[in-house]
């Protein structure tokens, strides 16, 4: 009862606290098991003493051995009774944890994992300590065995604070090595919009020119900057779980069973810098000027609802990462050659990988369009005044390249304006319906401040809808990699044909117009493809999706008409140029006629004879020059006919063309997004970019990286990970239990 009372007090403390459960569960009290592990030790030792040892002391066990009952059967019965007691305690402990369902903070999101972790950890730890108690009781009394066991566990549990007297903290180690830390504040898009998540990143302040980036060296900044860095490190240690732990103790070894490697995935750092359990590894240097990094999409939980062993992004090459979860290496200048080569290989191994990536985006996007979440995000952005937001506001450039035609910008702004108008209409309709339902008058004179608030809300919704439109384009650029639409490739072939045949006018201007039209056609083909797929269309679109399809179709028709107009114009110009060239040739030939008519007739006769002779004998004559001239004329005519004849692209040509087109459409829409995602074993992460993208797994905080341009991922690979810890503990449990039963079975009871 004492143990359950202590567990109840601990859980009530969590329930009543307004702090995020992530920070509470990962603090020193829980992580090092300074409370739970000793309590479970006392519980297991007491139960074991009553079941296995007490009968030996009062003579009841000697009486049982005198009966025709084997020791193996007695041992099995005692073991079943022990497991029954431990299971009852584990169930009661889990019931205490269920008090968290009555809280209003974020504990509800992790309560399932927490309850199962308490249940499994109590049983396994109880078995381990029971086995140790049985072995100790063969030499000592019950009280002595419990005291020895408790002291043993306590010493190892308190090894972490003792180690801090000897070893430097990770913050001090990094500070001495010249690292400085930078704090990034942001509102986390999570279940509770009031939770503020603080992210700390290690930043390279200075870098000597000419030093190889692969050396991963940081240079000490001035004393004032170093002092600020140390202060930030200390603040990080006080207010977060930023690499401030030592895991070389049995308390953590057993305490990890209470988490199953699942709780607080984004803050649960199983590896810390400069500790005995960590292989120190400074990650790649991210050059933010080039915006080169990884965009990643996590897959769903592999082992079900409770065991959240997520598929972490390993430190692998592009091929392996892409085949595991779908990863792109991006650069403002486009996809690098190695990336595409690796991507092609990955597509061959797993042709559905891009569809899975798109489904992941679409799932997040449908959740993002939820009415309540939209309002919440709008409120969050209003509170932060969009400071540091990488998303463009209304009127900003579409991040199109300098060689794009202004017609593309006009079409894009037209689409965004219609989308924003749709959002305004939906908001107005919704407000009108709400006013009617509540009986509130819509008269402007009676509304007063409400109208001002409504106008402000409309402004927020406009900004939000503009952001949604950008996200739609981002989705399209991803899905474009897997579009298999013959009409699309027919248009691509047509555009390439027209571009190649352009011989007059400003070539550069025509190429820019073709590139702009090409990009618009690609984008709206993909938009049309998405809205036509019922299984991919989110159900939460509602009337918004119909309006979206209408806008798409209108612009699609506009582009189709523009394409036809260009086609007719090009054909007309081509025919005029061809006819003009033919007339000039006829005029020149008429001027040369006269006295040479006889010679020309004889020359043609000789040419005809020579051609016939060449076809029959396949040999050359004295008139080879004239014959070759005739053949060249015929070849020129044939080439012109082939250019006038449309031919669809082959499979190889399509594959080559998709690489070229993807560069423009992908990076013209995605270059504003930068994700620094989780890799290895719970690296120290920070992220900026697309909100609500797997909000439980990424720290989706909009970040302004304008100050520091060179950032390190400070990573640590644990020598013994959480999963390995559980496996080792299970093996240790079986071994200790077998040894304890051996002692119990063959001891002398006389």
Swiss-Prot record:
GO terms for cellular component: plasma membrane. Pfam families: ABC2_membrane_2. One of its GO terms (molecular function) is ABC-type transporter activity. It is a multi-pass membrane protein. Keywords: Cell membrane, Membrane, Transmembrane, Transmembrane helix. It is found in: Cell membrane. To M.pneumoniae MPN_335. This is Uncharacterized protein MPN_333.
């Amino acid at each position: 009862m004492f143990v359950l009372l202590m567990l109840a007090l601990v859980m009530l403390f969590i329930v009543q606290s307004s702090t995020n459960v992530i920070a509470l569960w990962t603090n020193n009290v829980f992580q090092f098991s300074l409370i739970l592990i000793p309590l479970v030790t006392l519980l297991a030792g007491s139960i074991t003493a009553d079941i296995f040892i007490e009968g030996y002391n009062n003579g009841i066990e000697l009486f049982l051995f005198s009966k025709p009952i084997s020791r193996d059967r007695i041992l099995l019965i005692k073991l079943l009774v022990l497991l029954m007691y431990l299971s009852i305690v584990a169930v009661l402990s889990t019931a205490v944890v269920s008090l968290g369902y009555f809280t209003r903070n974020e504990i509800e999101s992790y309560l399932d994992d927490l309850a199962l972790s308490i249940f499994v950890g109590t049983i396994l730890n109880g078995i381990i300590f029971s086995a140790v108690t049985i072995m100790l009781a063969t030499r000592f009394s019950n009280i002595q065995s419990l005291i020895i066991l408790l002291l043993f566990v306590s010493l190892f549990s308190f090894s972490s604070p003792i180690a801090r007297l000897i070893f430097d903290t990770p913050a001090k180690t990094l500070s001495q090595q010249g690292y400085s830390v930078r704090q990034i504040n942001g509102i986390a898009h999570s279940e509770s919009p009031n939770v503020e998540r603080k992210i700390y990143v290690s930043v390279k302040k200075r870098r000597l020119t000419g030093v190889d980036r692969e050396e991963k060296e940081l240079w000490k900044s001035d004393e004032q900057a170093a002092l600020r860095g140390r202060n930030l490190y200390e603040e990080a240690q006080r207010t977060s779980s930023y690499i401030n732990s030592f895991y070389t103790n049995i308390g953590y070894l057993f305490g990890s069973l209470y988490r199953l490697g699942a709780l607080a995935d984004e803050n649960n750092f199983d590896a810390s810098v400069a500790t005995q359990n960590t292989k120190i590894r400074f990650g790649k240097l991210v050059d933010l000027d080039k915006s080169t990094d990884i965009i990643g999409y996590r897959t769903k939980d592999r082992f079900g609802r409770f065991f959240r062993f997520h598929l972490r992004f390993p430190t692998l090459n592009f091929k392996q990462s892409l085949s595991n979860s779908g990863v792109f290496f991006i650069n403002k200048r486009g996809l690098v050659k190695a990336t595409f080569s690796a991507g092609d290989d990955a597509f061959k191994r797993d042709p559905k990988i891009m569809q899975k990536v798109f489904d992941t985006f679409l799932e997040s996007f449908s959740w993002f369009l939820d009415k309540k979440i939209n309002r919440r995000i709008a409120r969050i952005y209003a509170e932060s005044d969009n400071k540091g937001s990488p998303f463009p506001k209304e009127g900003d450039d579409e991040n199109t390249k300098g060689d794009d035609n202004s017609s593309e910008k006009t079409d894009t702004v037209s689409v965004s304006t219609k989308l924003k108008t749709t959002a305004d209409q939906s908001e107005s309709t919704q407000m009108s319906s709400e006013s009617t339902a509540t009986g509130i008058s819509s008269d402007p004179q009676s509304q007063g401040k409400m109208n001002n608030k409504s106008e402000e809300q409309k402004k927020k919704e406009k900004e939000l809808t503009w952001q949604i439109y950008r996200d739609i384009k981002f989705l399209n650029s991803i899905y474009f990699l897997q579009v298999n639409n013959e009409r699309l490739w027919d248009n691509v072939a047509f555009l390439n044909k027209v571009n190649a045949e352009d011989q007059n006018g400003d070539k550069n201007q025509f190429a820019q117009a073709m590139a702009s039209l090409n990009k618009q056609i690609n984008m709206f083909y993909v938009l049309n493809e998405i809205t036509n797929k019922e299984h991919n269309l989110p159900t939460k679109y509602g009337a918004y999706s119909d309006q979206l399809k209408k806008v798409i179709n209108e612009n699609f028709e506009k582009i189709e008409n523009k394409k036809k107009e260009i086609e007719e114009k090009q054909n007309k110009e081509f025919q005029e140029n061809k006819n003009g060239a033919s007339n000039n040739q006829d005029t020149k030939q008429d001027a040369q006629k006269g006295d040479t008519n006889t010679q020309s007739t004889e020359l043609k006769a000789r040419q005809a004879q020579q051609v016939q002779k060449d076809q029959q004998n396949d040999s050359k004559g004295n008139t080879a020059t004239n014959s070759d001239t005739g053949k060249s004329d015929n070849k020129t005519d044939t080439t012109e006919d082939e250019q006038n004849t449309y031919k669809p692209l082959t499979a190889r040509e399509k594959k080559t063309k998709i690489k070229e087109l993807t560069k423009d459409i992908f990076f013209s829409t995605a270059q504003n997004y930068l994700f620094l995602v989780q890799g290895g074993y719970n690296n120290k992460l920070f992220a900026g970019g697309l909100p609500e993208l797997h909000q439980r797994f990424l720290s989706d905080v909009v970040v302004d990286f304008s100050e520091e341009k060179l950032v390190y991922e400070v990573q640590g690979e644990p020598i013994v990970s959480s999963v390995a810890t559980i496996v080792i503990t299970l093996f240790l449990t079986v071994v200790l239990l077998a040894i304890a039963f051996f002692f119990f079975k063959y001891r002398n009871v006389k």
